[in-house]
Amino acid sequence: MALQSPGATGASSSVSRLLSSAKLSSTKTIFSVDFVRSYCISKGTKRRNELSGFRGYSPLLKSSLRSPFSVKAILNSDRAAGDASSSFSDLKPQVAYLEDIISERGACGVGFIANLENKATHKIVNDALIALGCMEHRGGCGSDNTSGDGSGLMTSIPWDLFNEWAEKQGIASFDRTHTGVGMLFLPRDDNIRKEAKKVITSIFEKEGLEVLGWRDVPVEASIVGHNAKQTMPNTEQVFVRIVKDDKVDDVERELYICRKLIERAVASESWASELYFSSLSNQTIVYKGMLRSEVLGLFYPDLQNDLYKSPFAIYHRRFSTNTSPRWHLAQPMRFLGHNGEINTIQGNLNWMTSREASLRSPVWHGRENDIRPISNPKASDSANLDSAAELLIRSGRTPEESLMILVPEAYKNHPTLMIKYPEAVDFYDYYKGQMEPWDGPALVLFSDGKTVGACLDRNGLRPARYWRTSDNVVYVASEVGVLPMDESKVTMKGRLGPGMMISVDLENGQVYENTEVKKRVASYNPYGKWVSENLRNLKPSNYLSSAILETDETLRRQQAFGYSSEDVQMVIESMAAQGKEPTFCMGDDTPVAVLSQKPHMLYDYFKQRFAQVTNPAIDPLREGLVMSLEVNIGKRGNILEVGPQNVSQVVLSGPVLNERELEGLLGDPLLKSQILPTFFDIRRGIEGSLKKGLLKLCEAADEAVRNGSQVLVLSDRSDNPEPTRPAIPMLLAVGAVHQHLIQNGLRMSASIIADTAQCFSTHHFACLIGYGASAICPHLALETCRQWRLSNKTVNMMRNGKMPTVTMEQAQKNYRKAVNTGLLKVLSKMGISLFSSYCGAQIFEIYGLGNEVVEFSFRGSASQIGGLTLDELARETLTFWVRAFSEDTAKRLENFGFIQFRPGGEYHGNNPEMSKLLHKAVREKSETAYAVYQQHLANRPITVFRDLLEFKSDRNPIPVGKVEPASSIVERFCTGGMSLGAISRETHETIAIAMNRLGGKSNSGEGGEDPIRWKPLTDVVDGYSSTLPHLKGLRNGDTATSAIKQVASGRFGVTPTFLVNADQLEIKVAQGAKPGEGGQLPGKKVSAYIARLRNSKPGVPLISPPPHHDIYSIEDLAQLIFDLHQVNPKAKVSVKLVSETGIGTVASGVAKANADIIQISGYDGGTGASPISSIKHAGGPWELGLAETQKTLIGNGLRERVIIRVDGGFKSGVDVLIAAAMGADEYGFGTLAMIATGCIMARICHTNNCPVGVASQREELRARFPGLPGDLVNFFLYIAEEVRGILAQLGYEKLDDIIGRTDLLKARDISLVKTHLDLSYLLSSVGLPKRSSTSIRKQEVHSNGPVLDDTLLQDPEIMDAIENEKTVHKTMSIYNVDRSVCGRIAGVIAKKYGDTGFAGQLNLTFTGSAGQSFACFLTPGMNIRLVGEANDYVGKGMAGGEVVILPVESTGFRPEDATIVGNTCLYGATGGLLFVRGKAGERFAVRNSLAQAVVEGTGDHCCEYMTGGCVVILGKVGRNVAAGMTGGLAYILDEDNTLLPKMNKEIVKIQRVTSPVGQTQLKSLIQAHVEKTGSSKGAMIVEEWDKYLAMFWQLVPPSEEDTPEANSDHILKTTTGDEEQVSSTLAEK
């Protein structure tokens, strides 16, 4: 039976009926429950089979917090409340461990309703329940299909309901001013619950509060899902009277203190996690649980009671990637409802812990210690953000001010911000050095009971729509259409853009939009005065103009600090010459540092983490306006105190300092900088020496800070380096001091600067920053730049024109520029925008360092396999140091061969000998030659973690004849996703033909596929075919189609026909060799053939963004999976991830999002081009990722739901069997498949000069391609036979029988050169799936369940029109739960007629609010009209047809002022027309290829990455217009002359519309827009054409300059006067 997807809904007829009745019937809550149930389960369809469970192997916190407030102490102590305070030293700072943080990730659907008259009604609560139910598809469910990931409501306290209860209990009516209400989850055990309540009562009484009573909250337990019921708490309410405070804020503070004391009192108890305050307040209350949206109101009968009234409600539906039933993580939290993910959370938690010691405020009257700890590393990111906001609000900040501090907008590089509200810029500048942003996708709803509001993250990565009605109600929601609405009463429709906020003042009945909110908050204090008088900017200083060391001394120091000739030549000198990071290819096939037999720098044991699925990466090149490397140096003030003293800091434009700039900081009298040498003494032996040196350094740092130093400069600079005093690895030193200061409450008092010789690559800088350094002076790297510039070789090459001439100053500037650019890329991989959020965030994982090292310097980072001790690390450090001081010191740097293969250098898995042996075996079809190849692999050095494992068996060997045939095994083999463009057509098609012969699967990669490949060959003669004349070795019956067709971020070639001709569809989220990055196919590789497949022009660079712009969260991924299942219900959908710590949690979410296949790629996968630092330092080994994924999925009950595929460096049958034993069902080969078809590992893929035509588009090189399909067939058959042989030795007949059997693996008895590793993580097991691998692989494609398209396709007239190419007209209602509407119809048409062959006309009119992905993947002949509004992703992937969207006629707003469609419209569209009467959200026409559109205003990033088509915008646009736009044209009406500052001018030029052809194109599109939509704005423009034509700008990329529509003679050359005119106009406004 097929499994259903998230949000599977029935036909819309029942919805229509219910919506109609909703407007007329009473508003009793019981109706809303029925409505929602019908909405989501109509026609008896089953609930969707989203699955989840628990992750039971997360380690506990390394140190638990035991407080004097233990339960025993509380119950037996009579001491006064005033004595119940502990000092900061009693509260050991809690470390944020990565394993805890990544165990919970999520996303959601959220919204609020607020009555401006502050009128409490039950209708508000009822409407919130309805809206919540209409976003059920944005939430997740457990493996039992009924346990929701969480839903809840926050409202004001329903005093009428509680007073009725009080009266029945004989309790006097509650004094609303002085009564607090606690909503608690309590232990289920009766005795423990009694004990818990005693503790709570005791603390309340000791604090002077009177407990008025306890109320058992009525619940309907029978409707709770099985999983959730296992941990369902007892839910009670406690009512307390506060007698000593009159002000609301004081009452709330007292309740806050009580709650914190209670939490600390029970923290050390075994049942502590079972006690949780959902809320404890005098103003608000939260009802929530592990429930689906539609049952929240049923579970809590209170919510159905007419006496439950509130003037506002915040509602929240959660989608957690890892849902063991944890009731307290449901939302809303106590203040916030959060949709998104905080990707800086580890750093945020560490910094919050650091600042606890400095927290002081008069409002606490000396009780600050009683509210610590503020954060909880074991809670979710949302819970910790809520705790941070709660601290600020309870300390006197308003909710709006608190959120502006925590989630600031991108106020730098904002063209109009200084004009609109300069005081807000001062506010942000003030707090920039006080609080690191909580960065990541975030729609945050908030309320303290007096105000309710919402704010959006700086990048606008979550949808947020709002509207207001004439009866003074304001609505905000993740989607429009969540409530039945009389459109005639709607007076305003809008959306929150990036960094924007909306706030409703309930007490004064006012709505404040973004600018008003920011101005009001910024006016509280004279921030501008404080900033201007106290914040100092470090002025850039000139670089040194000559070398300061002799050449021999420079060489000696380079040797001492671990430099190799590759590091100097390929990294430092390349950066100095070109000003950018060097690019390489083919992935990393060398051993990781701990397995290497050569010494490595400490940095090499760290891998950068990256964003995938739960939050997006950022494009640092095209969206750099939201990023900044600015850093504040100096003491951070007390965040609870506001005043000028907090900004006595120095601002650096970036973290890389030259020597003179460091001197300037050292000379600043206010900073009181202290230089701390970082050397350790080995004169008494190596044992313990490094640890002693670190302890001495930490003590010196401690003393310096306590003596007032605000800057600690850790320096390994020495005039005379000594052989017996080696330098402590700077990363180790920085981490140790950072951790020491945190543990001692001193971290906020000083910045750390590294003055180091051992830092030259981007990765080194990133590591130092990530573990606490605010700035780095790379003195030896700068000296190396100077020596390079002065060398005779460089001088001669410049003189001879072999390299550009650069000055000494420019060489060093280039180097710093390259580092800064690389750092932005590192930040962006994780989706982090600001340096301040990355600093100290520890966004790395460690491979090969033991617990001693990690706990000393890198506490909280994941190191799953152990590794080097401090003494072993000291020995490795000394390997470099001793060489530098030996008598026979080399006269040149050694080439370790870490990057390029060289004899005698580091071992490379893909070495020339291996390639030759493999070529011989497959070309000669020689078993003997393959045996030699096998022996070569068996004799290689330990290279990857699986090399440390070997097989053991519980059975006797069997004859190989009893083992399943090779033909069955090869069906599990796949090739990697290599794009046609990165590799040649010959290579791509040869691989596909070979895999089809075998019954395996090839992967198209990005870039589409030629339809000629989809049909079997019938014209083969002597191995050649006129259909594919460039190939050889063919047979009749061969097909060159790729069974797996990839959907990557650029969506190149993704058309409806491409999708419907796939057996599987792969969503490529990340790539092993460069996770978190996008790609760019250089124009020189875009031939006419490639351009045709990608719907572009030859020679035009084609950019693939780092993220999918329709995947910013897990529920977005679920939507894309839904889209693909919609258009091709027969294709399994796979999601490609890259191994990293936490992948199990992500994989759990992917399985719940209804994926059929999860692919895990290792770091050692190949690439056509990538920065060296990415190839070497990002991504993890698949062995660890596979182990984590298998355990998590089994633990969560999800394993049977998905196929697990793994790839990365596979070379043999041994690799296949180890992967199988660890849980993989299918196995991918990339690099080896290319080698088998002819690749010689020249490693110049990125140059387009591949000598054998494997990775080149040059015809003369492609002609040299030697590969035959039979070669690859031979390779895979040899692999399969090898698998059979090993299975026979193990005594197993089928591969099925060993999948997941880690008990068949053991650690090899082998000694590593450097240390020993703990492989228990790889070998441990949590059980096996309940079904066999074959059963899982053969299960049906997961289903979307009944959808609106199914109903339409059952209409005889529609089917007749499709079958016989007729014309049909249909009209029907649509609702937000109707998603991807028309996608399935488009798939049916595309399968029958292709992308352009349908001659009929389907004219479908919808009325209402369309769900996500409306009109996706349309084909020509589909004409779709929507009267109403739509959510995100309208026209996604459309190849033709027409979409018209306009609001209903009887509205209370002007359409051109209203947001009518959501974000990311026309993503990847390859044709068709879109007309929108109204405004769109962010990223309109992103990656549009050929569609034409007219819209009346857009948000930020419109026309981003466009490669074709035409877009007309008749209104205002946001920032960053046309970033990455390499093709197509755009026309933008600029009535107020504000466009120029919003333009991204990197590629496009901007001109007035002077070409007659361009004018005709523009006018005809506007006329069509008026005709289709009735647009009054468009009609006015056409009527006064000459007037408005002069206001239009035409955006022209280079590829369009010679087209008739764009006359290059009139390109605007922006002058100073033009810019002044624009600035003047902005100032007037």
Curated annotation (Swiss-Prot):
One of its GO terms (molecular function) is 3 iron, 4 sulfur cluster binding. Pathway: Amino-acid biosynthesis; L-glutamate biosynthesis via GLT pathway; L-glutamate from 2-oxoglutarate and L-glutamine (ferredoxin route): step 1/1; Energy metabolism; nitrogen metabolism. InterPro entries: Aldolase_TIM, ET-N_metabolism_enzyme, GATase_2_dom, Glu_synth_asu_C, Glu_synth_asu_C_sf, Glu_synth_centr_N, Glu_synthdom, Ntn_hydrolases_N. Residues 108-507 form the Glutamine amidotransferase type-2 domain. It is an enzyme of class 1 (oxidoreductase). Disruption phenotype: No visible phenotype. The glutamate and glutamine levels were unaffected. Binds 1 [3Fe-4S] cluster. The active site is at 108 (for gatase activity). Keywords: 3Fe-4S, Amino-acid biosynthesis, Chloroplast, FAD, Flavoprotein, FMN, Glutamate biosynthesis, Glutamine amidotransferase, Iron, Iron-sulfur, Metal-binding, Oxidoreductase, Plastid, Transit peptide. [3Fe-4S] cluster binds at residues 1239, 1245, 1250. The keyword Cytoplasm does not apply. GO terms for biological process: L-glutamate biosynthetic process. Its cofactor is [3Fe-4S] cluster; FAD; FMN. Its EC number is 1.4.7.1. Expressed predominantly in roots and slightly in leaves. Low expression in the leaf mesophyll and phloem companion cell-sieve element complex. Residues 1599-1629 are annotated as: Disordered. Pfam families: GATase_2, Glu_syn_central, Glu_synthase, GXGXG. GO terms for cellular component: chloroplast; chloroplast envelope; chloroplast stroma; plastid. SUPFAM superfamilies: Alpha subunit of glutamate synthase, C-terminal domain (SSF69336), FMN-linked oxidoreductases (SSF51395), N-terminal nucleophile aminohydrolases (Ntn hydrolases) (SSF56235). It is found in: Plastid, Chloroplast stroma. FMN binds at residues 1186-1243. Residues 1-107 form a transit peptide. It catalyses: 2 oxidized [2Fe-2S]-[ferredoxin] + 2 L-glutamate = L-glutamine + 2 reduced [2Fe-2S]-[ferredoxin] + 2-oxoglutarate + 2 H(+). May play a role in primary nitrogen assimilation in roots. Could supply a constitutive level of glutamate to maintain a basal level of protein synthesis. Belongs to the glutamate synthase family. This is Ferredoxin-dependent glutamate synthase 2, chloroplastic. It comes from Arabidopsis thaliana. The lineage of its organism: Eukaryota, Viridiplantae, Streptophyta, Embryophyta, Tracheophyta. The gene is GLU2.
